[in-house]
């Protein structure tokens, strides 16, 4: 077996499959493009679903890739086991309706065992297979595999919802008896016992059925095109080929671990626990690559995952004695390890370091707050004479402050308290159930549509015309091809068309189809790409249409021009964002409609009003500069050499279309555009908002809509000016500010009067002192305007020794407000209010010295006041 670096393994994999006629699919962005069913790209096949479900036909049906992936369902196991990772690389080879079982197994065995390639010892390889899949068993035997090395497993059948499914066969490497201390042997595989001896290195899925959840597996229909989908983990291959005990001792992780050793002064022991080293080395890879691909730490979705990974890594850094920000110092090391195939981390090093360091600094403040919260919880336990920290409190520390359970346990036990592990697990399960319920259901490859996939007739989109005559090639009605149609809805393909199919954020054209007499025979309501790339026109049929007949196709020209204004303005906006807020502001999505444009981009904070003003100004400057817009076709590399912006994660063909706006903007784009920027007329940003962690959205209008937006603003300003009696529009802001200042003065004066009135009333309230259980208390209903006045009462009460406890109740509108204040350690205000509030159909809580609650049943106020004596 050859001893290869991870980079050599990856390259040899790709080279082998290229020698078998495969094309290399570049690794896609970790943030899925146009796939709302996935939080992250989580496998090598995830980016190829469009090929497997038949919605797109690939240029080459043989594909290979090395795909970075993230899975976060096992975060807690990372560092505890030898092979769990959040980010990993899947090496894959795929056949879309081309070769099948014989080639997949035969070539796979060749790659693994040939001296020209990996050169694995044949006697170290074991294979599992689906018991009913005798063909795979026989193919392995034909390759020279001993029957004793073939293990039938009932679970070796791959399916996920509706769509492609079939048996799979897994390949394992036997690391020998040293990793089998109980000498269990092959039963470890046959009985699926967790072990470190037999390492799964490759899975070959034989997709030959269309799974249908409504019928038994035996009734699944054969796929019109059978597929091969395989995945081999680079980290596991590296561990085996480098003779590493775990994945973490490979060249993918050890350079990171060595840097952590330097930062911590601690030493990594291959035979020791090393959990903290492993957690940091794993999490930093996922964190940096995700940020490089446009995701940013936040409080939801992908952002929450990244924040959790970073905080877990920071806490493990502290366990190693690293109490300063340090993760950002690992960016260079991670980037250098992966540079040969993934240069993006080093290319974006400064930006990634900035984001990670800022997030670490924020978390340092959060840790201080969390420590304070834990101290309060432990103090409360002591006051209440309890010895166990409740699970819900542990979960809050874990979920809100990022405290690992083991850290909470360590600190609590140091203080002499136990941990409610079962309560924590229950709280964790509740959150996981909520998360699962909120997930967008998906992940299935989808059923193949044989009718659409069978369209092979050529069709060409003509960019530079709004009307043309063309022959009708294909009619599909009721999901079947037909020669003619006279009513209802149908899908049409023409030899050529002026209708743009929805793509790249630009909406489809609409329009009409006319016969040779000039009569409208169909209305085009939508245009999408067929699996083989032809524009597929969805039409409402008004009169007879037949294949082979020529028709005149006319798009809605006015609508197209409005869409083009917005699309061209989107390119200007993208360039302006780069210039004003930074090159990290890359496109995360766009929509170019007739009425507006919407542009989503990566950015870690709200765009300020001043920045928006600069962006808007810069775009309009380019419009007024009347820049010439040119489009050319070339290959991707030439386009990039010209400085063309390519959307990261987007797949491009051999020939790409380059749209250049003067010397200001150059982008790869397949959409339609104006001839000159001046045709946009005017550009106006109407909204900027956050739509998720690390993603901002700008909505803007152009042309007539921009003029209307400005006029509406002017009308509103005129109305305000008239209301505040400003002599001119430019004076309106000053008049509004003056009125605001006057209002603030009146509010301050009113508050002072209320405070004096409350102080006067307090004198009467504080006279009525009662006593119970040796505690002096005041319990009274007061007439106040708001809850703030109750706090003013409490502040006055604190100044003198009126009593030990104060309970005030006020009916304000339809709500009952309750305040409890305590000066004695014998009475916990927060606990007391929890007993009193339910009496008035309310709830609340607070600190030992002050607590408030809200209720809704004012009829029970007297009952609440009477209950005070029992609760002190």
Curated annotation (Swiss-Prot):
Q: Name one GO cellular component term.
A: cytosol
Query: Gene3D superfamilies per the record?
Result: 2.40.30.130, 3.10.310.40, 3.30.54.20, 6.10.250.550, Bira Bifunctional Protein, Domain 2, Threonyl-trna Synthetase, Chain A, domain 2
EC number(s) of the enzyme?
A: 6.1.1.7
UniProt cross-references to Pfam families, sorted A to Z? DHHA1, tRNA-synt_2c, tRNA_SAD
Q: Where does Zn(2+) bind?
A: 567, 571, 669, 673
Per UniProt, the cofactor note for this protein states: Binds 1 zinc ion per subunit.
GO biological process: any one? alanyl-tRNA aminoacylation
Which cofactors are reported in the record for this sequence?
A: Zn(2+)
Molecular functions (GO terms): alanine-tRNA ligase activity; aminoacyl-tRNA deacylase activity; ATP binding; catalytic activity, acting on a protein; transferase activity; tRNA binding; zinc ion binding
Q: Which PROSITE patterns match?
A: AA_TRNA_LIGASE_II_ALA (PS50860)
Signal sequence annotation: none
This enzyme catalyses:
tRNA(Ala) + L-alanine + ATP = L-alanyl-tRNA(Ala) + AMP + diphosphate
Indicate where this protein resides in the cell: Cytoplasm
SMART domains according to UniProt: tRNA_SAD (SM00863)
Under the heading NCBIfam families, the entry gives:
alaS
Q: How does the record comment on the protein's domains? A: Consists of three domains; the N-terminal catalytic domain, the editing domain and the C-terminal C-Ala domain. The editing domain removes incorrectly charged amino acids, while the C-Ala domain, along with tRNA(Ala), serves as a bridge to cooperatively bring together the editing and aminoacylation centers thus stimulating deacylation of misacylated tRNAs.
- Family membership, please give it: Belongs to the class-II aminoacyl-tRNA synthetase family.
Protein name according to UniProt: Alanine--tRNA ligase
Q: Which organism is it from?
A: Streptococcus pyogenes serotype M18 (strain MGAS8232)
Q: Which gene encodes it?
A: alaS
């Amino acid at each position: 077996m050859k001893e290869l670096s991870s980079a050599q393994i990856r390259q040899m994999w790709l080279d082998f499959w290229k020698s078998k006629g495969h094309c290399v699919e570049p690794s896609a962005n970790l943030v899925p493009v146009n796939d709302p069913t996935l939080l992250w790209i989580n496998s090598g096949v995830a980016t190829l679903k469009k090929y497997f479900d038949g919605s797109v036909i690939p240029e080459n049906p043989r594909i290979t890739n090395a795909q970075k992936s993230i899975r976060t369902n096992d975060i807690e196991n990372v560092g505890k086991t030898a092979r769990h990772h959040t980010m990993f690389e899947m090496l894959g080879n795929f056949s879309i309706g081309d070769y099948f079982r014989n080639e997949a197994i035969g070539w796979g065995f060749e790659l693994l065992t040939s001296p020209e390639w990996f050169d694995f010892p044949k006697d170290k390889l074991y294979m599992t297979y689906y018991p009913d899949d005798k063909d795979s068993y026989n193919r392995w035997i034909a390759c020279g595999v001993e029957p004793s090395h073939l293990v039938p497993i009932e679970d070796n059948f791959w399916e996920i919802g509706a769509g492609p499914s079939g048996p799979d066969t897994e390949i394992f490497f036997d690391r020998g008896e040293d990793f089998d201390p109980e000498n269990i042997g092959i039963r470890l595989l046959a009985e699926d016992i967790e072990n470190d001896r037999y390492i799964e290195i490759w899975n070959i899925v034989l997709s030959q059925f269309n799974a249908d959840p409504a019928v038994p597996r035996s009734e699944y229909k054969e796929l019109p095109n059978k597929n091969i989908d395989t995945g081999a983990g680079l980290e596991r291959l590296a561990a085996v080929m480098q003779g590493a005990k775990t994945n973490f001792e490979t060249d993918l992780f050890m350079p990171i671990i060595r840097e952590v050793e330097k930062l911590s002064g601690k030493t990594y022991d291959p035979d020791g626990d090393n959990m903290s080293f492993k957690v940091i080395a794993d999490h930093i890879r996922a964190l940096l690559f995700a940020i490089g691909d446009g995701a940013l730490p936040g409080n939801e979705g992908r952002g929450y995952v990244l924040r959790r990974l970073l905080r877990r890594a920071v806490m493990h850094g502290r366990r190693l004695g690293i109490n300063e920000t340090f993760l950002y110092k690992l960016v260079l090391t991670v980037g250098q390890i992966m540079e040969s195939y993934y240069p993006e981390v080093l290319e974006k090093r400064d930006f990634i370091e900035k984001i990670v360091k800022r997030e670490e600094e924020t978390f340092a403040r959060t840790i201080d707050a969390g420590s304070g919260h834990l101290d309060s919880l432990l103090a409360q336990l002591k006051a209440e004479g309890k010895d166990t920290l409740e699970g819900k409190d542990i979960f809050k520390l874990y979920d809100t402050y990022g405290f690992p359970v083991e850290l909470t346990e360590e600190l609590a036990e140091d203080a002499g308290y136990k941990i409610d592990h079962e309560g924590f697990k229950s709280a964790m399960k509740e959150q996981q159930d909520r998360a699962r319920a909120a997930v967008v259901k998906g992940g299935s490859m989808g059923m193949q549509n044989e009718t659409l996939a069978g369209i092979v007739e050529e069709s060409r989109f003509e960019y530079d015309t709004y009307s043309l005559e063309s022959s009708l090639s294909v009619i599909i009605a009721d999901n079947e091809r037909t020669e003619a149609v006279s009513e209802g809805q149908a899908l049409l393909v023409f030899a050529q068309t002026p209708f743009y199919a929805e793509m790249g954020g630009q909406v489809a054209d609409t329009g009409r189809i006319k016969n040779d007499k000039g009569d409208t025979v169909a209305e085009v309501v939508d245009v999408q790409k067929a699996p083989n790339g032809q524009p597929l026109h969805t039409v409402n049929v008004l009169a007879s249409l037949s294949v082979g007949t020529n028709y005149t196709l006319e798009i809605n020209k006015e609508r197209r021009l409005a869409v083009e204004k917005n699309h061209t303005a989107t390119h200007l906006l993208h360039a302006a964002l780069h210039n004003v807020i930074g090159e990290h502001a890359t496109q995360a999505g766009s929509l170019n409609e007739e009425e507006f444009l919407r542009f989503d981009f990566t950015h870690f904070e709200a765009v300020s009003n001043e920045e928006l003003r600069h962006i808007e100004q810069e775009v309009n400057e380019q419009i007024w500069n009347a820049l010439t817009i040119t489009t050319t076709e070339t290959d991707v590399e030439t386009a990039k050499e010209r400085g063309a912006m390519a959307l990261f994660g987007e797949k491009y063909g051999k020939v790409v279309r380059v749209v250049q706006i003067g010397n200001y903007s150059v982008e790869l784009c397949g959409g339609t555009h104006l001839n000159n920027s001046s045709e946009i007329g005017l550009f106006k940003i109407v909204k900027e908002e956050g739509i998720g962690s690390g993603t901002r959205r700008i909505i803007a209008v152009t042309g007539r809509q921009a003029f209307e937006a400005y006029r509406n603003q002017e009308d509103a300003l005129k109305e305000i000016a008239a209301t505040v009696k400003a002599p001119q529009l430019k004076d309106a802001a000053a008049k509004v500010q003056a009125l605001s200042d006057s209002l603030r003065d009146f509010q301050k004066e009113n508050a002072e009067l209320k405070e004096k009135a409350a102080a006067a009333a307090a004198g009467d309230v504080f006279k009525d002192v009662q006593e119970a259980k040796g505690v002096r208390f005041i319990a009274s209903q007061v007439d106040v305007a708001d809850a703030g006045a109750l706090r003013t009462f409490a502040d006055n009460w604190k100044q003198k020794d009126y009593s030990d406890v104060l309970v005030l109740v006020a009916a304000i509108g339809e709500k009952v407000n309750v305040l409890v204040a305590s000066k004695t350690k014998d009475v916990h205000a927060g606990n007391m209010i929890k007993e009193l509030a339910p009496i008035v159909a309310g709830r609340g809580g607070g600190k030992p010295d002050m607590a408030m609650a809200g209720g809704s049943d004012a009829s029970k106020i007297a009952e609440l006041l009477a209950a005070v004596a029992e609760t002190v």
